[in-house]
Amino acid sequence: MLSQQDLQQIAQKGISQEQIESQLNEFKTGFPFLKLEAAAGIGRGIIAPDAAERKQYEDAWNAYKAEGKRVVKFVPASGAASRMFKNMFAFVDADYDVPTTDFEKKYFDSIEKFAFYDALDAICQKNEGKGIKALIADGNYKAVAANMLKAEGLNYGQLPKGLLLFHKYEDGARTPMEEHLVEGALYAASNGEAHVHFTVSHEHMELFKAKVAEKADTFAKKYGIKYDITFSEQKPSTDTVAANPDNTPFRNDDGSLLFRPGGHGALIENLNEIDADVIFIKNIDNVVPDRLKPETVEWKQVIAGVLVTLQKKAFEYLRILDAGATDAQLAEIAEFVSKCLCTDAKGKKVDAAYLREKLNRPMRVCGVVKNVGEPGGGPFLTYNQDGTVSLQILESSQIDTNNEEYMKMFTQGTHFNPVDLVCAVKNYKGEPFNLPEFVDKTTGFISSKSKAGKELKALELPGLWNGAMSNWSTVFVEVPLGTFNPVKTVNDLLRDQHQ
């Protein structure tokens, strides 16, 4: 099946032959659907703290930071913005010249509201000899759209989302990258320093670094802190091999194997290399202007406070187990694991070994928002490989759509996860966990793609906040919808929250 040439290609990527064979086997066997117990809800896996409790959690977080702990804000930022502009690419290629769809009309009717308006106007002047208003008056709408998308214009069709102008301010417009630097200063700084880590695609790395270098000093002065900003790329060793519909390796025209990025689950490797006590994770496009940041900052501190409060208790209990727990202590620890960490033993023997195993693992607290029809992974009580039940974030692809009961759970779930996580990644002795050990490898999924018109099967690794964190202790906290403002299309920037 694999030639000498294949083995060389695999070795260059840092992948073993066993991994490739295991991936090709996964195409044949597929991945099992998850066994669900219930959708999580308030009082069943989701905490909804009142004002007094929120204050306690914020205080707990600030006290924790004051101990000189190392906090890092981790931002997956490798996504290209191309999908944001799908409708505008379609307009440029359409066989009509004036805005026709509702989307196109909205874009051009509100064009002055975009934070990139001035930059686009300047590039139109340069390339077309006319500004946006004059081009529109001439009916030359396509020139405006093309100058936004194409390389000789703003190149927004190719740039990473993190470098597009999102929000207007008196002193100019800001990109999501800049908004994340500001957030880092506001809730993730300790010892007068904010550590921010961006994962960036190889092709955009130099540009991203240059833009960060250009802006970081401004915010460091503004907030009176120092920044330590680091970058990484998805590792080539996390790419997965593609297969033909008959599960044989898909090959490029030159006979080489085709590899594809393994999805955001690959970032567990990047996360594993971060030296931190606590790591905040939030997507690059989920940012708001300064006027709306206080709510985000408050809730970030609340979920971090929940995390360090639970972690402190777990560490205390692990030390008791080390010293030899009495029956009364074992009962107390068992109650903590079942009530606070929402882990149900399901008939397994709840002894010291079981409790240690459930406590001595990475921990995450995830913000969840009420379902308002935004697509996203949901919080569920799910069966683990060992037969116990605990909390997970599930995507629809992990659920058997033929199981009516499960589909009902999924569609009637009250909350979803907007990728808003705070993670504790060291054990009670202060040593870092090896995060890849806590991945549930059976939670990848297979999708259908094509290359040069040929159908292929692609293998996605267990998602970063799904199967890659399957064996972590997980707790959910309800956060307000105002803390979640993703930008999936360019017109989302016209929503009030981004103005």
Task: Give the label of every model feature segment.
Residues 1-35:
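Polybasic, low-complexity association/targeting segments
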Residues 341-364, 373-378, 388-393, 400-499:
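Primarily single-stranded nucleic-acid-binding OB-fold modules
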